Structures are given as C-alpha cells and as structure tokens.
Amino acid sequence: DLLSGVRSPRGFMLVCLRGEEAQFETDRRHMGLTELTMAEAKNLVPILNTDDVMRAALSTTAQDIDTDMMLQRFVGLLRTNGGQVETNQTVQAITKISEGWQVDTNQGQFTARKVINAAGAWGDEIAKLAGIPEIGLTPMRRSVARLAAPGGLDVQSWPMLFGPGERWFAKADASA
C-alpha cells in the first residue's frame, strides 16, 4: 500500500482562552468536537494552564502525515511510470495542447499528457496559468519555534493543540 506507515494517530485539541469563547464555540460545533472538562484536558496535556484555558474540545480521529515519506513514495511511483520531477524553475505559461499540456518555464519548454499542480498554497497561481478556476487558496507566512519539552515531559502522545480560528497551533515534532 502506497500510504502504509505514512499516517499515525495524533488527535487534536481546540483550546479556548478568555475572550475567545464565541469563536471557540463556532469552531467546536463546525468540527463536531467533543468538549472536555478541564481535568480531562489537563490529563491529556499536563502543561495546560487552567487559569488561562477556559474550555477545551477534542477530536481523536486526526492523524499526522509523514510528508517526506509520502512525497518520496509519490515521486517513486511517478518515476516508475515514466514521469519526471522538474525543480528550481519558474512556470511562465501552461497551455492545453492536443497531446496534453505544454509548460513553459524559465529553463525551457516541457510537454506531458498530464501535469500535477504541486504548488501547495500557491496552487491557485499555477491553476490560473493553466486557465483553471482558482479555489481560494491563500499562501500564509508561518513562524516556527522549536522548544524542548518542559520538565522533560514526553509530548509525543499529546494531541495537536490549536486556538479558535486556527491562529496558532502547537504539536510534537518527531524530528526535534
């Protein structure tokens, strides 16, 4: 199976600080999350400060994805089937032709029966070049802080944590 071993259980916990109750409730309902007592939440994530965290809700179905492993498997499958990966190029135009697609880059021109848009958050920009309707992707700048677990705690089994509106998140990093 192509995705065997790529996913692992994680779960996620939505946590609410004072003043975020309305957005928390909207998110909790929208995601169908089970609300926890503060004791239950603290049992799962012992460092939660229950003086600041007012409410918490949990999903046990969320999973981590080993994105590097997944990508390497997809690249292997692509190459096994005669495909190629082209990197470090700027796509300038994508044109539908009778044999499939023509892609013009700053490094040259390529033709293929199929083209995979792997631009992630910038996928709408590539879609636009191909005359394909945008779906509303918004690239966002993120900041990362890698911190040692407090007090030597084992955080690997903790759910991912995030706040209402998904303005921030925290999760154990397997490579830390």
Segments predicted by a language model, with ranges:
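Dinucleotide-binding Rossmann-like beta1-alpha1 core, especially the glycine-rich loop
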Residues: 1-47, 53-55, 167-169
